[in-house]
Amino acid sequence: MRPWTLAVTKWPPSAPVGHWRVSTRLSSSPGQLWGRPSNLSVEEHRASAPAGRSPRMLHPATQQSPFMVDLHEQVHQGPVPLSYTVTTVTTQGFPLPTSQHIPGCSAQQLPACSVMFSGQHYPLCCLPPPQLIQACTMQQLPGPYHTYPHLISSDHYILHPPPPAPPPQPTHMAPLGQFVSLQTQHPRMPLQRLDNEMDLRGDQHPLGSFTYSTSATGPALSPSVPLHYLPHDPLHQELSFGVPYSHMMPRRLSTQRYRLQQPLPPPPPPPPPSYYPSFLPYFLSMLPMSPTTVGPTISLDLDVDDVEMENYEALLNLAERLGDAKPRGLTKADIEQLPSYRFNPDSHQSEQTLCVVCFSDFEVRQLLRVLPCNHEFHAKCVDKWLKANRTCPICRADASEVPREAE
């Protein structure tokens, strides 16, 4: 059972079953109406709806059907208090066609009316101010129900008198998704976000204060249907029925929200260029350079005479530091001139008992050779050493000078 069906068919105990008496009165304030006995009753006309459809107010697109409520003056006993609020605000919103009128409504002029069920407001009728009330009709809303999500949300919305006559519409009207967003038209909308939040709601695209799906499109409207606009301002005073049915109303689609409170960090700066863009300049900078080649450019055509002169000067400098050139070792005649004797441990007077060339102890009857520095060695070991060197293996003294000085 639908909530609006409960609102019109569930009679209170004090009222008869046949009719429901509604008492209203005009209060001192221009924006409120308080209940008083005015002989108003509410009944539902099911004959106006097509066969096979039940009257509904706002529902998904697959179950859309017209819903009409007539207000008739009728005297009845057992009144039930009913209060509603009238608020006049600038009209902006999405179009609501109301081209049919049913006679029999009250002669009082009502700017607008709305109903709140369980904290949510729903519009019931939209009437032009210059005319007397003849009918209150709710036509079938074109498009799926998520085209009008603010009507089933917790925000406050009401119907208001239409703006001046709009310009004639073309033969084929654009779908509802192409209307200008409510947020751009109305600067005082309560749904504006002052912080830097961004809601990503699935495949739906935000359009002003409500979202619409790109996959669902509403039927084209006839050019003869007048357009009345629903405003987007909060309702200051409410019309409430004591029928709790919040669990029966369609809820908002649960979507996952992502919040970005801080801006993304800037991209890192590009790395500075390397000092050596290639290997060749780096390699050339590491090469040694002579004083003659230092200049703005590197010349590879060097004079051969200059190179030879430079090398010769370097050799002369080395010869001055080394002294006169001498033969590498002693000749065989020079080696034989060195004194030698047979080793006898009883008559041996030197403290040296081994050969430093072969690291062997002196034995009896071995031939020893004595160098001018008085160092003794095996004759075979030291002769071989003197053929390649001119110095003593122990003290590095010249072995060829001492004998000549002795002579």
Swiss-Prot record:
Q: From which residue to which do the RING-type zinc fingers run?
A: 355-396
Citing just one GO molecular function, the answer is: zinc ion binding
Q: Which domain of life is it from?
A: Eukaryota
- Decide whether keyword Repeat is in the record: no
Q: Which PROSITE patterns does the protein's record reference?
A: ZF_RING_2
The region called Disordered is annotated at: 26-58
Arranged from A to Z, the UniProt key words for this protein are: Metal-binding, Zinc, Zinc-finger
Protein's name in the database:
RING finger protein 44
This protein's gene is called Rnf44
